[in-house]
Amino acid sequence: MNIEAVFVDRDGTIGGTGHFIHPNEFAPYSFSRDAIQILKDHNIRTFACTNQHRISRGEATLDDFNKEFQSYGFDDAFICPHSSDDACNCHKPKPGMLLEASKKYNLDLTKTVFIGDVGSTDMLAAHAVGAKKILVLTGWGYGSLKQYRESWAEIEPDYVAENFLEAVKWIISKCEG
């Protein structure tokens, strides 16, 4: 498997609970920085891709999030600051952030992977552009797979991982295998 880039959701995937936590207070899981470094060591671009509607409410800024993602080692961050009620094309499950990344970095999105914890947003956005889909069971992941499965029933994840690090190890095994 030739992977050009990996997109990673924030809340519930790299840390937190799945709920909004301001970047100044957000703590990544103990393995998240290692997972990002493994991708970088294998020359795989790593992008944060997150809905953060609290920006539109003035509770945080794009700069707050960009600094956070840069400190973790992400190559870039694609952040939707809008609420789900706004008529934007970037709020997941719409694929606007992925399309923006594709244009900016000349990516073939069918050669990318999306790692996230929410089936009805992360997995649907990935599916819309033909990206591989990895659902992690942290954050909302377990609930997405069980009680909320009907909201994305027509989509199957390519892999279900216990967490972000396991997802990255699966990607690397497919690249090397």
Give, region by region, the residue ranges found by the protein language model.
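Non-cysteine beta-strand/loop elements that form the S-adenosyl-L-methionine
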Residues: A5-D11, F74-C80, V136
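A short, structure-level motif marking secondary-structure boundaries and short turns
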Residues: H19-H22, N51, H82-S84, L107-D108, ...
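Substrate-recognition element of Asp-dependent hydrolases with the DxDx(T/V) motif
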Residues: S32, I36-N66, F74-D86
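Active-site neighborhood of HAD-like aspartate-dependent phosphohydrolases
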Residues: M1-F47
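Asp-based, Mg2+/Mn2+-dependent phosphohydrolase catalytic module
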Residues: A60-D76, D85-F114, V118-G177
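Short, flexible loop segments at the rims of nucleotide/cofactor-binding pockets, characterized by
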Residues: P23-A27, I55-R57, C88-C90
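Active-site flanking residues adjacent to catalytic metal/cofactor-binding acidic residues
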Residues: V8-R10, T50, I115-D117
